[in-house]
């Protein structure tokens, strides 16, 4: 009987600890972490609500292929800061990423790929993009740009950095 009570006490402490602790949330991100490039000359500080919503929308519409910032269909191109900066046009800012989500192009920028990459142009093929507004795309872009500051090289770093 005493053994049963001890197990119950240990289980209660364990579950109480789980309830009282949580992973990092958008509310815990400071202003410096939530500040990202708006375009090539300006920055913007996302609100905690925008950061939270960006994470939710990314998980809803993008994480199937871009889990952890990697790209399942093309592992050589990921969502790391270096990859986004190397794209033409640059995609390492909010406006560049929103433009890409509206009009996706190849890494060199020469060819459109809206038929094979989810975008607001191809909602018939990729229905998850159907109801995303420009504000939603802004929040998703903010989430993508925040991640290198939150999880470092693990974001877009592939299996080697996990």
Swiss-Prot record:
Its cofactor is heme c. One of its GO terms (molecular function) is iron ion binding. Heme c binds at residues 62, 65-66, 117. GO terms for biological process: photosynthesis, light reaction; respiratory electron transport chain. This is Photosystem II extrinsic protein V. Pfam families: Cytochrom_C550. PSII is composed of 1 copy each of membrane proteins PsbA, PsbB, PsbC, PsbD, PsbE, PsbF, PsbH, PsbI, PsbJ, PsbK, PsbL, PsbM, PsbT, PsbX, PsbY, PsbZ, Psb30/Ycf12, peripheral proteins PsbO, CyanoQ (PsbQ), PsbU, PsbV and a large number of cofactors. It forms dimeric complexes. Belongs to the cytochrome c family. PsbV subfamily.
